[in-house]
Curated annotation (Swiss-Prot):
Reaction catalysed by this enzyme: UTP + L-glutamine + ATP + H2O = CTP + L-glutamate + ADP + phosphate + 2 H(+); L-glutamine + H2O = L-glutamate + NH4(+); UTP + NH4(+) + ATP = CTP + ADP + phosphate + 2 H(+)
Gene Ontology BP, a term: 'de novo' CTP biosynthetic process
Top-level division of the source organism's lineage: Bacteria
GO annotations of cellular component type: cytosol
Binding-site positions, Mg(2+): D72, E142
Gene3D superfamilies: 3.40.50.880, P-loop containing nucleotide triphosphate hydrolases
Positions with a binding annotation for CTP: S14, D149, I150, E151, K189, T190, K191, P192, T193, Q194, K225
Protein name: CTP synthase
Classification via PROSITE patterns: GATASE_TYPE_1
Length: 537
């Protein structure tokens, strides 16, 4: 079977949920026995989001092969339960970088390099590359931004051309749009959708399916109207209502017939959709009987997308323990010695996620100390582990002023220091320790009991590491180095001997958690937090 291509565009406004729509469709097609891959085209000129502020972009999602990518790739991985790669997130910056590099090498000798055909050909090659050598049945490509944006035009032109390059029977265009509800008149309005599709058609793309985001039910009459003005059949107008839980969306879209429409359009030879496992999972999520309160202590807490994979992984841990996870978002800048008890008195577990820089660092260190002293389950990720280590060195070893050399280059006790292979690197973008690395676990440690394996593989994104100069005295004072690189040179996991559940990890376990396969550390962190809750009840 030829590889089929599905392109998901968006209209009217951004943040409509194109990524969730693409991920949900991917799940439905996988449930039909098809091999699916999903990619995202981002129209910004940055090479990747690695140097962008979380306030601008949200979380940076890291793949196994070390690519810093859009947070939508996290949704894709969680929904289709497949590990993606750097080929699954392409930016305008990458496209132009590649074309200009080829021009400098003389690959276009004699030609005037232009948007068409050189940029569009490069874009098309990235679409095809996802499926190369992998026997992929369906490639779903989300086009970032909104139809009408200048930045998106080369991508839209490229996918218009692909339809004729590979054959119209091998391409399906899905347009996600907004049908707003006006409370004053009590009406849903279709005009924004009509204009969005008109804009798309003006550049040569006729959508095959229109997915309408709405907070109210869309009547058959309205679907008929949208179909008439947008040149699609009524049955090809799909409503996508707001859902209480993201993982309900595939089932909602299946009930609307989205996957059937796609299979019919692409003439896909596949099984009927078997959503049994997904239905069981969603039903379980709806019936969770326990509650657990987790403090997430960070500096971007007003923008939840900055920690989206952590939030999802906490929820997955809750699913495995029949528990709703209630997150208390705490800005680490607000935490002081005088008010920490007020902030954390009703908390069952404390999590400090990754991050960079000195803003709010002392509040994170205080939170780690509170968890250590009060035997509250603690989970520190990347910078969160480093904060726990700094607090331990200050309080237990009495190393006054102990710190990370990232935050205080003049500290007398740099218990966290720049990795040796990072010291001669000047550029910021894509130069950290990135991607999947092995980690050897200490037998009988909390981490080993969680994983049940001798060697694990986790994804990293950092420049600073545990300083081995202090290894012996930290171990003698009760710190357990439960995970290291295979050569034992890099400390990847720390625990505290006399604590029921205190773990810091240098990697990012949240990136590998799935709703149907919760990450073992998040699963056990929630379990320990539930036990802590009962203890203090």
């Amino acid at each position: 079977m030829n590889t089929k291509y599905i392109f998901v565009t968006g209209g009217v406004v951004s943040s409509l949920g194109k990524g969730i729509t693409a991920a949900s469709l991917g799940r439905l097609l996988k449930n039909r026995g098809l091999k699916v891959s999903i990619q995202k085209f981002d129209p910004y000129i940055n090479i990747d989001p690695g140097t962008m502020s979380p306030y601008q972009h949200g979380e940076v999602f890291v793949t196994d092969d070390g690519a810093e990518t859009d947070l939508d790739l996290g949704h894709y991985e969680r929904f289709i339960d497949e590990s993606l790669s750097r080929n699954n997130n392409i930016t305008t910056g990458k496209i132009y970088w590649s074309v200009i590099s080829k021009e400098r090498k003389g690959d276009y000798l004699g030609s005037t390099v232009q948007v068409i055909p050189h940029i569009t050909n490069e874009i098309k090659s990235r679409v095809y590359k996802v499926a190369e050598g992998k026997n992929i049945d369906v490639v779903i490509t989300e086009i970032g931004g909104t139809v009408g944006d200048i930045e998106s035009l080369p991508f839209l032109e490229a996918i218009r051309q692909i339809k004729y390059d590979v054959g119209v029977e091998n391409v399906c265009f899905i347009h996600v749009t907004l049908v707003p509800y006006l409370k004053k008149s009590g009406e849903l309005k279709t005009k924004p959708t009509q204009h969005s599709v008109k804009e798309l058609r003006s550049i040569g793309i006729q959508p095959d399916i229109i997915v309408c985001r709405s907070e109210k039910l869309i009547s058959n009459d309205l679907k008929e109207k949208i179909g008439l003005f947008c040149n699609v059949e009524r049955d090809s107008v799909i409503q996508n209502l707001d859902a209480e839980n993201l993982y309900e969306v595939p089932l909602m879209l299946h009930r609307e017939g989205l996957d059937n429409l796609v299979c019919k359009k692409l003439k896909l030879q596949c099984n009927e959709t078997d959503n049994t496992e997904w239905i069981i999972m969603v039903d379980k999520i709806k019936k969770l009987s326990k509650n657990v309160n987790i403090a997430l202590v960070g500096k971007y807490v007003e923008l939840h997308d900055a920690y989206i994979s952590v939030v999802e992984a906490l929820s997955h841990g809750g699913y495995a323990n029949d528990a709703n996870v209630n997150i208390k978002w705490l800005n680490s800048e607000d935490i002081t010695k005088d008010n920490i008890e007020e902030y954390l008195k009703d908390i069952d577990g404390i999590l400090i996620p990754g991050g960079f820089g000195d803003r709010g660092i002392e509040g994170k260190i205080l939170a780690a100390g509170w968890a250590r002293k009060n035997k509250i389950p603690f989970f520190g990720i990347c910078l969160g582990m480093q904060c726990a280590l700094i607090e331990f060195a200050r309080s237990v070893l009495k190393y006054e002023g102990a710190h990370s050399s990232e935050i205080n280059p003049e500290t007398k006790y740099p218990v966290i220091d720049l990795m040796p292979d990072q010291k001669d690197i000047d550029e910021k973008g894509g130069t950290m320790r990135l991607g999947k690395y092995p980690c050897k676990l200490l037998k009988n440690s909390i981490s080993f009991k969680a994983y049940g394996e001798d060697v694990i593989y986790e994804r990293h994104r950092h420049r600073y590491e545990f300083n081995n100069i202090y290894r012996d005295e930290l171990i003698e004072s009760g710190l357990v180095l439960s995970g290291t690189s295979p050569d034992s040179k890099l400390v990847e996991i720390i625990e505290i001997k006399e604590h029921p559940w205190f773990i810091g990890v240098q990697f990012h376990p949240e990136l590998k958690s799935r709703p149907n396969r919760p990450h073992p550390l998040f699963r056990d962190f929630i379990k320990a937090s539930l036990n802590s809750k009962h203890k203090f009840d």
